[in-house]
């Protein structure tokens, strides 16, 4: 081989190797402080789940059964919600491939899956296992789990089947045997995926309800810490730096409540706090957003760990509860433009904290039954996704 040919051969090898490294790195969803992470929550209820069919939704379409029965409670009330793409199953990989393409095209690059496990076993796992993880393009999207460890009341999930709001299908607290099953299953099935989202080498694992977490360990903070330390050690055995536990409460309340919860998450060794809903509900979306910023400021005052902002698209859970009406929904100024303005403030918030990952959480990707979703519908089309893209492209920076 002559000298010129050798040089080209070596150069080609370097290029191929560089491309290989880039491809490998692109599938690893490790947070970097210079990158933005826009994470949308997924409520995986719209498919035929065995436990769901037996106890909750009987027609084989999951919660679409309830969503389709939404009815207007006041003039101009947009019910039932109508998906632009129709009533698709969230455990269909072809559907999720479309989701991932739409999300990544518009600046959403992480999905947070609500994940359920009761003493009776798993619930709604198929959306993640068969939908997301079998989507051909899934590794272009980061993901992590939020353990949705809340009780499952009868009327919350299907008021048309149950009118009894005092009984529950499953209790959220789990015993030690089930807890160790959770730990093993989560590490083996999910943490090992190259696109599982990590902070400082630690897979992120969200927890929705602190009180129910404590109840799984007899109500003891000390025993709960031991349980979480067990999870951490098992993750280290699997080759990870530990587990980044993240608290995602359903909404905000008082400063005193924030102080109590901040002390608890730090005693348990949590790594961060965000929210499932942004809190501060109001009929006016602008007031709702301003209230949520005050709640964010409360958390900032009491936390010694990172807080990541949450932005809700809206709120309307009237399909679940016949007694609710106008005062229980967000219906003034609830538009993609208002949402974009609020998201731009969240972006500014993370920009002002250069020492922590630039993570923003959006409620939600598909909370149709709660009126909070980015997915395109028959009213706004792709309006909310376009709003995310505009903000992440800097088009709203001039309004700061």
Task: Give the role of each language-model region.
Residues 10-20:
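Bacterial N-terminal signal peptides
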Residues 2-10:
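Bacterial N-terminal signal peptides that target proteins for export
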Residues 29-400:
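Glycan-processing catalytic domains of CAZymes
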């Amino acid at each position: 081989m002559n000298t010129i040919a050798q040089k080209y051969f070596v150069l080609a090898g370097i290029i191929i190797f560089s491309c290989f490294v880039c491809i490998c790195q692109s599938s690893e969803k490790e947070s970097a402080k210079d990158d933005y992470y826009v994470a949308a929550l997924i409520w995986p209820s719209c498919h035929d789940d065995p436990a769901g069919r037996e106890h909750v939704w009987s027609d084989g379409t999951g919660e679409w059964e309830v969503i389709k029965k939404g009815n207007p409670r006041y003039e101009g009330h947009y019910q039932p919600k109508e998906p632009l793409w129709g009533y698709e199953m969230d455990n269909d990989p072809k559907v999720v491939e479309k989701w991932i393409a739409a999300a990544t095209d518009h600046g959403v690059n992480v999905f947070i899956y609500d994940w359920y496990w009761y003493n009776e076993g798993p619930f709604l796992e198929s959306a993640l296992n068969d939908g997301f993880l079998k989507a051909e393009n899934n590794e272009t999207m980061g993901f992590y789990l939020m353990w949705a460890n809340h009780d499952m009341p009868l009327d919350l999930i299907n008021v048309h089947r149950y009118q009894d709001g005092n009984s529950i299908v499953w209790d959220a607290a789990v015993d030690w045997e089930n807890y160790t099953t959770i730990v093993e299953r989560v590490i083996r099935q999910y943490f090992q995926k190259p696109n599982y989202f990590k902070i400082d080498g630690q897979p992120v694992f969200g927890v929705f309800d602190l009180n129910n977490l404590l109840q799984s360990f007899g109500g003891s903070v000390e025993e709960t810490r031991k349980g979480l330390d067990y999870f951490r050690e098992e993750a280290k055995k699997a080759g990870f730096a530990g587990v980044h536990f993240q608290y995602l409460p359903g909404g905000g309340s008082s400063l005193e409540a924030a102080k109590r919860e901040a002390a608890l998450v730090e005693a348990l060794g949590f790594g961060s706090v965000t929210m499932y809903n942004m809190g501060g509900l109001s009929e006016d979306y602008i007031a709702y957003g301003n209230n949520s910023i005050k709640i964010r400021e409360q958390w900032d005052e009491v936390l010694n760990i990172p807080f990541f902002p949450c932005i809700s698209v809206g709120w309307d859970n009237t399909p679940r509860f016949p007694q609710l009406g106008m005062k229980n929904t967000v219906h003034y100024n609830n538009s993609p433009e208002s949402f974009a303005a609020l998201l731009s403030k969240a972006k500014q918030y993370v920009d002002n904290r250069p020492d922590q990952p630039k993570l923003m959480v959006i409620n939600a990707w598909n909370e149709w039954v709660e009126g909070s979703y980015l997915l395109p519908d028959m009213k706004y089309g792709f309006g909310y996704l376009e709003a995310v893209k505009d903000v992440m492209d800097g088009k709203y920076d001039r309004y700061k």
